[in-house]
Amino acid sequence: MKILYSLRRFYHVETLFNGTFVLAGRDQETTGFAWWAGNARLINLSGKLLGAHVAHAGLIVFWAGAMNLFEVAHFVPEKPMYEQGLILLPHLATLGWGVGPGGEVLDTFPYFVSGVLHLISSAVLGFGGIYHALLGPETLEESFPFFGYVWKDRNKMTTILGIHLILLGLGAFLLVLKALYFGGVYDTWAPGGGDVRKITNLTLSPSVIFGYLLKSPFGGEGWIVSVDDLEDIIGGHVWLGFICVFGGIWHILTKPFAWARRAFVWSGEAYLSYSLAALSVFGFIACCFVWFNNTAYPSEFYGPTGPEASQAQAFTFLVRDQRLGANVGSAQGPTGLGKYLMRSPTGEVIFGGETMRFWDLRAPWLEPLRGPNGLDLSRLKKDIQPWQERRSAEYMTHAPLGSLNSVGGVATEINAVNYVSPRSWLSTSHFVLGFFFFVGHLWHAGRARAAAAGFEKGIDRDLEPVLYMNPLN
């Protein structure tokens, strides 16, 4: 009887129902992996693996282009983006394309161009993927040594890491260039309710930029998610760009130190596990960012945050009842606390009622009404502008609380709109994917460590007690 694992390879046993099935000339016997393990069969075939990765990039870019055009085709300019289930157009609008004051869409042509460019790019990537998967050399080491590699070659691996870091740094600089020189980006804090503007006065102070990293992630601190002005965001990308580029150059020019050689497992599956861990962290951070941050993700495009919708409801009814003659400064609510206004634990004047829990919300429609000690009573009586009333009424009825088959919005709000907020979609999907990637990290890290420790062949079954027990029947 043939042994289950290949003598040529050193991977886990994969027991197949049909061990003789051959796909693309690579069967389980020669690769150690079954057909359904996909790219695992290509672990040591750098040329074929390149094809798989390029084709995968093509699929990703094709989705981006096709979905982009789908959203353009369905877009109704009269309705806010967040009511239309859009997740790509809000990103383009945030970059300042096609929008004007208040986030109003003036021109959808840039969105169309974006979709077409992604489709064309995906065709190029798709062709490259098919070429390298089917026609190109199986391995790159002989013909193209610069692009070839061996997984355990630590120096080559850190060189590849360095190249990736430089590309990421250049990507960060692209956003900086867009904000500084190519039309600017959308600033939800621009006076009068948001506008596209060039970011001129960058925040480059390391104490400010790295201060975000040192903040607590909880409550009113909010770690990097608490960033609330574009100068800090674009300045942060300047720092990130330089750090990534210089880190990349460092990794290209140096070899791993002894402690790093000892600390890491140096195999393809280990690198996969490290990458999955990083993507998992990114997913969890993105989840919090899109859920809580209304500067990087402006509410004009993504809908209000949960706290923002709640505070907007309190503000809307304060405006209504003040018009009807209520004295909002002294009216008592059912609990004996202020009905419209109360004090926070640190003494600021905040909105009363259930929304007190969201007292540290900052939003561009609300900040003009604050003074040095929180909400300013005289401003609430005299300075409320029509655009602030309109926007808060709109946000009140569009809380990001809907489920797929129910009415969206606050359960007690009779005017709530039946929709699911893009914030709900994006934060939930990134949390779920972040979690799955974390599980994938644990799985592949465990396999990589087992292989490195030398017991990847599985357990010796010869002495299992079950082999010596009587059959159940």
Swiss-Prot record:
Q: Any note on cofactor binding?
A: Binds multiple chlorophylls and provides some of the ligands for the Ca-4Mn-5O cluster of the oxygen-evolving complex. It may also provide a ligand for a Cl- that is required for oxygen evolution. PSII binds additional chlorophylls, carotenoids and specific lipids.
- Which family does the entry's similarity section mention? Belongs to the PsbB/PsbC family. PsbC subfamily.
User: Which residues does the record give as [CaMn4O5] cluster binding sites?
Assistant: 367
Q: Which organism is it from?
A: Agrostis stolonifera (Creeping bentgrass)
Pfam families from the UniProt entry: PSII (PF00421)
Under the subunit heading, UniProt states: PSII is composed of 1 copy each of membrane proteins PsbA, PsbB, PsbC, PsbD, PsbE, PsbF, PsbH, PsbI, PsbJ, PsbK, PsbL, PsbM, PsbT, PsbX, PsbY, PsbZ, Psb30/Ycf12, at least 3 peripheral proteins of the oxygen-evolving complex and a large number of cofactors. It forms dimeric complexes.
Q: Locate the N-acetylthreonine modifications and list their residues.
A: 15
Q: What is its main location?
A: plastid
Gene Ontology molecular functions: chlorophyll binding; electron transporter, transferring electrons within the cyclic electron transport pathway of photosynthesis activity; metal ion binding
Chain positions listed as propeptide in the UniProt record: 1-14
Superkingdom assignment: Eukaryota
Record GO biological process = photosynthetic electron transport in photosystem II
Q: List every position bearing Phosphothreonine.
A: 15
**Record-linked InterPro entries:** PS_antenna-like, PS_II_antenna-like_sf, PSII_PsbC, PSII_PsbC_sf
Q: Indicate where this protein resides in the cell.
A: Plastid, Chloroplast thylakoid membrane
> How is this protein named in the record?
Photosystem II CP43 reaction center protein
Q: Give a short account of what the protein does.
A: One of the components of the core complex of photosystem II (PSII). It binds chlorophyll and helps catalyze the primary light-induced photochemical processes of PSII. PSII is a light-driven water:plastoquinone oxidoreductase, using light energy to abstract electrons from H(2)O, generating O(2) and a proton gradient subsequently used for ATP formation.
GO cellular component term, pick one = chloroplast thylakoid membrane
Query: What NCBIfam families does the entry give?
Result: psbC
Which spans are transmembrane here?
69-93, 134-155, 178-200, 255-275, 291-312, 447-471
Alphabetically ordered keywords of this record: Acetylation, Chlorophyll, Chloroplast, Chromophore, Manganese, Membrane, Metal-binding, Phosphoprotein, Photosynthesis, Photosystem II, Plastid, Thylakoid, Transmembrane, Transmembrane helix
The way it spans or sits in the membrane comes to:
Multi-pass membrane protein
